[in-house]
């Protein structure tokens, strides 16, 4: 890996990604809260953006680790997803995602869901490739 600690930190900060979404009825379950599968899809989406901004490589999701549903996300609320690269290796990296929920007409957020997503950089043949030049 040919990257300095300073460059790594600069890339991590520059790749931090925020996405805000409204929770509409078509994204909810029979409890009138955000469907877990939709939450995970949104989390994968924001994490691949952060990972790509960090590496500027073609990446594939290889795992999602320990998704914790801490608070319900009711229909009609706003969520903010925040993704940041937390570690990287030769061909892989991990992104932590926090999903915060807030009422549509109230101030304040609380953490609703957290999880970590792992990615591998791949070449045009879908074989692992170094994230940074060696």
Predicted region positions:
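HotDog/MaoC-like acyl-thioester-processing domains
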Residues: 3, 9-19, 74-75, 86-134
């Amino acid at each position: 890996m040919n990257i300095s600690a300073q460059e790594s930190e600069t890339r991590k900060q520059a790749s931090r990604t925020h996405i805000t979404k409204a929770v509409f009825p078509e994204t909810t379950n029979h409890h009138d809260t955000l469907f877990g599968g939709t939450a995970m899809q949104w989390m994968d989406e924001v994490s691949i953006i952060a990972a790509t901004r960090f590496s500027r490589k073609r990446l594939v999701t290889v795992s999602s680790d320990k998704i914790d549903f801490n608070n319900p996300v009711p229909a009609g609320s706003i969520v903010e997803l925040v993704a940041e690269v937390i570690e990287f290796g030769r061909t892989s990296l991990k992104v932590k995602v926090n999903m915060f929920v807030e009422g549509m007409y109230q101030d304040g957020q609380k953490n609703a869901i957290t999880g970590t997503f792992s990615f591998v950089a791949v070449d045009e043949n879908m074989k692992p490739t170094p994230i940074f030049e060696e």
